[in-house]
């Protein structure tokens, strides 16, 4: 009874909620109906609190609809039950931005020696605090969840990483984060590693760039120590690999990682990967690997929106014991939009100039300190440049941007260009409308809202937006 009732609720919730929300928060819940009490089990406290806060009314409404007067009491608990709703009975969302696959069945874990053989050991890394189990984790202690600035652009990724750190190997495995350079993916990897190590001091957590995995494998082959290499990587509790796209065209490395990936998953050992693009779009990587990358949860890390950029600047300034005026933070954030590293670099330059000259940090001072950087941004990002870039991206004529044509093949790129003009320039809505064939400002506003909606609903539109932002901001 519990499976059929909760299955009905799941099917309706999947229809009502955005695919990202359903996969992230609702799908992991398990249900048990006993003594007229429906207990929903969440994988951790974070998910439980979120579901109860955001979706309790939806669930109660559906129970009332399906059960009539015989409504069960609803309870929430952290944990799991043995029998779960088969994932095959849930309607698969069409091209979701976040995908969730069934977790692998647990297997008997083979314990290895705590440290690899002396004939081979991992390549050195700049940051190498030794874990208590003897593994060089390479996790940077400076990066944690407390100093990661949350915004709409990274909210899902941050939530997923928190869940994984609460319950490694069980929450979402593998977790795949993708997005452009300098958006915080590496920070999140280190934050997960630190959180796991804080909770379980003896946990064997390894962070690395994908190229280091390749270097370690080559070294192991040269020293005839491939078995030690395998033991090391297959006996960790969490493997965090950055920039997995660098495995492209490295067939032997892909072969070894394929088997390592399978071994870790079978042992319920956590895997987190990052890339600069969606798994299926990584060229030069075997299809069987790309398929496995999407088995767990795939989350996009977007370029930060204005409010998040301002918050990042204020947080970084606070770390330097600098009071950054609000108007200065907004001035910088409105003009530098591509990624977090660019913002940090600009702020560091402003702070250094202020320290050297002893001057107060004002808008005029910032304009002078960043004059070359701001001039370059203003030169790169104009409405005309946006129109040309979007037209080329969607393979339409520049004249179509200004025309009255309403076919989707033209209207959608035009809406995208308007939304980008609002995000990337300082022009007002009427000015943007004038640049698009004399359109009214309400048309521009509608276009911006439409693109926001489509980015939530369509993976393709979200990818187009991110790709165009990167192109125009580089």
From Swiss-Prot:
GO MF annotation: an example: ATP binding
GO CC terms: cytoplasm; plasma membrane
Location relative to the cell: Cytoplasm
Key word Oxidoreductase present: no
Highest rank taxon of the organism: Bacteria
Keyword vocabulary terms for this entry: ATP-binding, Cytoplasm, DNA replication, DNA-binding, Lipid-binding, Nucleotide-binding
Keyword presence, DNA-binding: yes
Residue ranges, annotated region (Disordered): 112-137
Biased composition range(s): Polar residues: 128-137
Entries under InterPro entries matching the protein: AAA+_ATPase, Chromosome_initiator_DnaA, Chromosome_initiator_DnaA-like, Chromosome_initiator_DnaA_CS, DnaA_C, DnaA_dom, DnaA_N_dom, DnaA_N_sf
Binding site for ATP: 182, 184-186
Region described as Domain IV, binds dsDNA: 355-474
Positions of region (Domain III, AAA+ region): 138-354
Positions of the UniProt region annotated as Domain I, interacts with DnaA modulators: 1-90
Domain II as annotated region, ranges: 91-137
Record's signal peptide: none
Similarity remark: Belongs to the DnaA family.
Protein function: Plays an essential role in the initiation and regulation of chromosomal replication. ATP-DnaA binds to the origin of replication (oriC) to initiate formation of the DNA replication initiation complex once per cell cycle. Binds the DnaA box (a 9 base pair repeat at the origin) and separates the double-stranded (ds)DNA. Forms a right-handed helical filament on oriC DNA; dsDNA binds to the exterior of the filament while single-stranded (ss)DNA is stabiized in the filament's interior.
Subunit field text: Oligomerizes as a right-handed, spiral filament on DNA at oriC.
PANTHER family: CHROMOSOMAL REPLICATION INITIATOR PROTEIN DNAA
Domain text: Domain I is involved in oligomerization and binding regulators, domain II is flexibile and of varying length in different bacteria, domain III forms the AAA+ region, while domain IV binds dsDNA.
Protein name: Chromosomal replication initiator protein DnaA
Organism: Photobacterium profundum (strain SS9)
Lineage: Bacteria, Pseudomonadati, Pseudomonadota, Gammaproteobacteria, Vibrionales
């Amino acid at each position: 009874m519990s499976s059929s009732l909760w299955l009905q609720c799941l099917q309706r919730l999947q229809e009502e909620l955005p695919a990202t929300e359903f996969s992230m928060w609702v799908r992991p819940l398990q249900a048990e109906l006993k003594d007229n009490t429906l207990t929903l089990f969440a994988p951790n406290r974070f998910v439980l609190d979120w579901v109860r806060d955001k979706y309790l009314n939806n669930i109660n409404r559906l129970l009332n609809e399906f059960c009539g007067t015989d409504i069960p009491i609803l309870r929430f608990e952290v944990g799991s039950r043995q029998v779960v709703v088969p994932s095959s009975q849930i309607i698969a969302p069409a091209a979701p931005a976040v995908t969730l696959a069934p977790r692998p069945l647990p297997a008997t874990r083979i314990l290895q020696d705590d440290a690899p053989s002396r004939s081979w050991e991992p390549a050195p890394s700049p940051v190498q605090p030794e874990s208590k189990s003897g593994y060089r984790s390479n996790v940077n202690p400076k990066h944690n969840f407390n100093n990661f600035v949350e915004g709409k652009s990274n909210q899902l990724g941050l939530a997923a990483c928190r869940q994984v750190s609460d319950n490694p190997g069980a929450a979402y495995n593998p977790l795949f984060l993708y997005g452009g350079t300098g958006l915080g993916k590496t920070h999140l990897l280190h934050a997960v590693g630190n959180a796991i190590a804080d909770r379980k001091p003896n946990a064997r957590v390894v962070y690395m760039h994908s190229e280091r995995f390749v270097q370690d494998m080559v070294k192991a082959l040269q020293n005839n120590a491939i078995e030690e290499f395998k033991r090391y990587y297959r006996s960790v509790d969490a493997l965090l690999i950055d920039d997995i796209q660098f495995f492209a065209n490295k067939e032997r490395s892909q072969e070894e990682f394929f088997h390592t990936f399978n071994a870790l998953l079978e042992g319920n050992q956590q895997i987190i990967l990052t890339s600069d693009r969606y798994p299926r779009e990584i060229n030069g990587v075997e299809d069987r690997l790309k398929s496995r990358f999407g088995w767990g949860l795939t989350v996009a890390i977007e370029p930060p929106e204005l409010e998040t950029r301002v918050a990042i600047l204020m947080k970084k300034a606070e770390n330097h014991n600098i009071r950054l005026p609000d108007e200065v933070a907004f001035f910088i954030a409105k003009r530098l939009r591509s990624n977090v590293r660019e913002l940090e670099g600009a702020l560091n330059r402003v702070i250094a100039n202020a320290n050297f000259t002893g001057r107060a940090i004002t808008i005029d001072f910032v304009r002078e300190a960043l004059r070359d950087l701001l001039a370059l941004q203003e030169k790169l990002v104009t409405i005309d440049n946006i129109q040309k870039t979007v037209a080329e991206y969607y393979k339409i004529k520049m004249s179509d941007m200004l025309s009255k044509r309403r076919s989707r093949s033209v209207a959608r790129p035009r809406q995208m260009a308007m939304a980008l003009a609002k995000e990337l320039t300082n022009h007002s809505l009427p000015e943007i409308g004038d640049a698009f064939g004399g359109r009214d400002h309400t048309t521009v506003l509608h276009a911006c809202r439409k693109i926001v909606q489509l980015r939530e609903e369509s993976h393709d539109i979200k990818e187009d937006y991110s790709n165009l932002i990167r192109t125009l901001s580089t």
